[in-house]
Amino acid sequence: KRQTVYDWHTASFKGRNSYSKTDPDATFMHMKEDHLQNAQLKPGYNVQIGVDSEYIVATDIYQDRNDVWTLVPFLKNIEEKLGFRYPSVTADSGYESEEGYSFLRENKQKAYINPKTYRQWKKRSFKNDISKRENMLYDKEKDVYTCFAGKKLTAKYIKKQKSKSGYESQITVYESEGCSKCPYREKCAKTRENKQLYVSKGLIEKRDESYQNILSETGIKYRMNRSIQVEGAFGVLKNDYNFKRFLLRGKTKVKIEILLLCLGYNINKLHSKIQGERTQSYLFQLKQA
C-alpha cells in the first residue's frame, strides 16, 4: 500500500522536481508577493503572453519555472493558433538560449533578444574582470584566446551538451599553456588547474547577431514597446484587475481562466483605444532628443 502511494507521487512529478498536493499540475515557484518583492516558494504556473499592438494575441501556461524553456513551444503555439508567423520576436534576457536562436533562424524570424550578460557588460566591474572571455583577445583564424598575462588559450576538445528539450549544442573547451607562476592567477583562475574557458561558438555567433539587432533604431523601438506593452499588460492584470491567484485548479481550467482574463483585457484595451482615437496605433514611437 505504501509503495502504491509512493508510485503515485512519483508519477505526479511528470519530470518536475516538485508539485502541489492541492493542485498536482502546479509547480512550486518563487513568488514575489510581499512589499519588498522577496521570493516566497508557492505552487503556481508560469504564464506567458504575446502582445501585438497592445493586444494580448496569445497566452499559455507552463509548469516549468524557467522562461527559457517556454520560448520555442510558445512560438509554435502562436503560429498554430494564429495561422501565420511573426517576422520578428522581441523578448528579454530570460528567454535567451542557443536553441531559441536556432529556432528563430530556421523559421526566418529576426531575434531581438537581450543577451543574459547585457547588463553586466555595462558594469565597470565586468569590464575590469580579466577572467571573463569577453575581456580576452581572440584570434578567429587561429581559434586562440590571449589572456591578460599574454598567455594563449587553445582549443583542447569539443564536448556535446544536450538540453532538457533534447537540443544538442557543442561546447569548445580552451585551456591556457600554464598558470602556475602567473602573477594574475588569483584574479583569473579559480582552481589550481590551468585556466579553462567553456565556449559555445554557436551561441556567441547568434547572440552577437541579436545584440546588433537590439542596438539598431528598430531594435530600440521594439525593446521599448516590449517594456510598455508586455510588462504593462502584466501590470494591468496584476494591479489594476487585482489578479493575484488563480481560482481554479488543474492546468486545463487554469488556462481557461487566464484566457478569459486576457479576453477582458483586450476588450478594455479596444474601448480605451477607440476613446482615445488610437485604433490605428501599433507601436509607441521613440521620443526625439
Residue spans for each PLM region:
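Anion-binding and metal-coordination hotspots
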Residues: 1-289
